[in-house]
Curated annotation (Swiss-Prot):
It comes from Streptococcus pyogenes serotype M18 (strain MGAS8232). Keywords: ATP-binding, Ligase, Nucleotide-binding, Protein biosynthesis. Allows the formation of correctly charged Asn-tRNA(Asn) or Gln-tRNA(Gln) through the transamidation of misacylated Asp-tRNA(Asn) or Glu-tRNA(Gln) in organisms which lack either or both of asparaginyl-tRNA or glutaminyl-tRNA synthetases. The reaction takes place in the presence of glutamine and ATP through an activated phospho-Asp-tRNA(Asn) or phospho-Glu-tRNA(Gln). PROSITE patterns: GATB. This is Aspartyl/glutamyl-tRNA(Asn/Gln) amidotransferase subunit B. It is an enzyme of class 6 (ligase). InterPro entries: Asn/Gln-tRNA_amidoTrfase_suB/E, Asn/Gln-tRNA_Trfase_suB/E_cat, Asn/Gln_amidotransferase, Asn/Gln_tRNA_amidoTrase-B-like, GatB, GatB_C_1, GatB_Yqey_C_2, Gln-tRNA_amidoTrfase_suB_CS. The gene is gatB. Heterotrimer of A, B and C subunits. Belongs to the GatB/GatE family. GatB subfamily. It holds the Pfam family GatB_Yqey. One of its GO terms (biological process) is glutaminyl-tRNAGln biosynthesis via transamidation. GO terms for molecular function: asparaginyl-tRNA synthase (glutamine-hydrolyzing) activity; ATP binding; glutaminyl-tRNA synthase (glutamine-hydrolyzing) activity. PANTHER family: GLUTAMYL-TRNA GLN AMIDOTRANSFERASE SUBUNIT B MITOCHONDRIAL AND PROKARYOTIC PET112-RELATED, GLUTAMYL-TRNA(GLN) AMIDOTRANSFERASE SUBUNIT B, MITOCHONDRIAL. It catalyses: L-glutamyl-tRNA(Gln) + L-glutamine + ATP + H2O = L-glutaminyl-tRNA(Gln) + L-glutamate + ADP + phosphate + H(+); L-aspartyl-tRNA(Asn) + L-glutamine + ATP + H2O = L-asparaginyl-tRNA(Asn) + L-glutamate + ADP + phosphate + 2 H(+).
């Protein structure tokens, strides 16, 4: 029997507000344990939550970016459960009226086609703390993360393969990153993914029993975990077994999934309205204000790059991978840079430099203005493409004018025949054996003179002009 794969994803995105959702503590990542906490985070008796308006702003932006409807009257709920990293014994979340609902995004499949994935809801909530189990037999609680604002984005079960799930996550990450509400760094926990997967016989309308996957710390592991579950569940069903509703974690070392617990349902959490927070009214003016702050998103930019700038689909995809890279490209083009040349530099030398340095483009000194000027002095013959690589490294580390640096460092390309011809004659005089080989008709003897000339000019001879003049002067030797 063959089965159809049904996948839905729950993505937790940590919002990059300065303070937490209900307390004034810093929400920044990487501090010493419990450094970013106060009495609200520790749930001291009598303390009350105070809503961070910036979190609602971010929620509205996310809902708009994901083509969602927005609840104009929004409230919070208590999700009750006990765990050491949750000192209140409940989490403030949203249950029946999330900030956003009925959304969708479009993903691009491996064959080049597109598919619309529906999004059921996006709700705001507070993050829990973190438990660390030490080798000394003790467990430690760090509440720095307690109260950090999250938006949970829940897709419909519209994905039919691990590859589609991977494409959905890639598209979702791009969109959220473009809004500026999160840096979506999985390695820092600001984007976390849970996957729900079930199988059903082809032709059956009813979904099968789903399994939830956790501990998916990379998009690659999401795909691997789902691929393993497809095989595990299919094998179990074909042998007459029954799929239980359970939570499993992906074990990267063993490339498989391991049972964590039997899955709870909503009733287990005993949701009820949060009594310490009011109803929040989101009017059209507020929504319009947030909409005005949104940028053009990756799909629209890719279409523009292909249709208006003549770039390939691959180039357009690479350039829109992050908003900062896309903004850099667009600024450079707006300053007169040739789109293809700018694209080549961003994907070539610049990308290699960034990878080697472990930096992003906003962390180096190169500006779009610097890059456009450098491309211009390559085009007008001031420097060669080879010399430009050296110039770029200087600009990346120090910034400044490309032309000014080239002139100060004595890197201006020599293109004047009146300067080059005497140097060529001196090369002939200094290399009599090579001249003799050339005159005797020795094969490829002329090739050596290019190297001699570049050495004599310290690499500053214009390669095209040098080759032309060498050919002329060598012909005179032959004659």
């Amino acid at each position: 029997m063959n089965f159809e794969t049904i996948i839905g994803l729950e993505v937790h995105v940590e919002l990059n507000t300065n303070s937490k959702i209900f307390s004034p503590s810093s929400a920044h990542f990487g501090e010493d344990p419990n450094a970013n906490t106060n009495v609200i985070d520790w749930s001291f008796p009598g303390v009350l939550p105070v809503m961070n308006k910036g979190v609602i702003d971010a929620g509205i932006k996310a809902a708009l970016a994901l083509n969602m409807d927005i609840h104009k009257e929004m409230h919070f709920d208590r999700k009750n459960y006990f765990y050491p990293d949750n000192p209140k014994a409940y989490q403030i979340s949203q249950f029946d009226e999330p900030i956003g609902y009925n959304g969708w995004i479009e993903i691009k499949l491996e064959d080049g086609s597109t598919k619309k994935i529906r999004i059921e809801r996006a709700h705001l909530e507070e993050d829990a703390g973190k438990n660390t189990h030490g080798t000394d037999g003790y467990s430690y609680v760090d509440l720095n993360r307690q109260g950090v604002p999250l938006i949970e984005i829940v897709s419909e079960a519209d994905m039919r393969s691990p590859e589609e799930a991977y494409a959905y996550l890639t598209a979702l990450k791009e969109i959220i990153q473009y809004t500026g509400i999160s840096d979506v760094k999985m390695e820092e926990g600001s984007m976390r993914v849970d996957a729900n997967i079930s199988l059903r016989p082809y032709g059956q309308e009813q979904f099968g029993t789903k399994t939830e996957l956790k501990n998916l710390n990379s998009f690659s592991n999401v795909r691997k975990g789902l691929e393993f579950e497809v095989e595990r569940q299919a094998k179990l069903l074909r042998s007459g077994g029954v799929i239980r509703q359970e939570t499993r974690r992906y074990d990267e070392a063993n490339k498989g999934t391991i049972l964590m617990r039997v899955k709870e349902g909503a009733a287990d959490y005993r949701y009820f309205p949060e009594p310490d927070l009011p109803l929040y009214e989101i009017d059209d003016a507020w929504i319009d204000e947030m909409r005005a702050q949104l940028p053009q998103f990756p799909a629209q930019r890719r279409a523009k790059y292909e249709e208006e700038l003549g770039l390939s689909a691959y180039d357009a995809s690479q350039l829109t991978a992050t908003k900062v890279l896309s903004d850099f490209f667009e600024t450079a083009v707006s300053l007169g840079g040739d789109a293809k040349q700018v694209s080549n530099w961003l994907q070539g030398e610049i990308a290699q430099f960034l990878n080697a340095e472990g930096k992003t483009i906003e962390e180096i000194a190169l500006t779009p203005e610097n890059l456009v000027e450098m491309i211009a002095i390559i085009a007008d013959g001031t420097i060669s493409s080879k010399m430009a690589k050296k110039v770029f490294v200087h600009l990346a580390k120090n910034g400044g004018s490309a032309r000014a640096y080239v002139e100060k460092a004595g890197l201006v390309q020599i293109s004047d025949p009146a300067v080059l011809v005497p140097i060529i004659h001196q090369v002939f005089a200094d290399n009599e054996a090579a001249v003799a080989d050339f005159k005797s008709g020795k094969r490829n003897a002329d090739k050596a003179f290019t190297g001699f000339l570049m050495k004599a000019t310290k690499g500053q001879a214009n390669p095209q002009v040098a080759q032309q003049l060498l050919a002329q002067e060598l012909q005179k030797l032959r004659d």
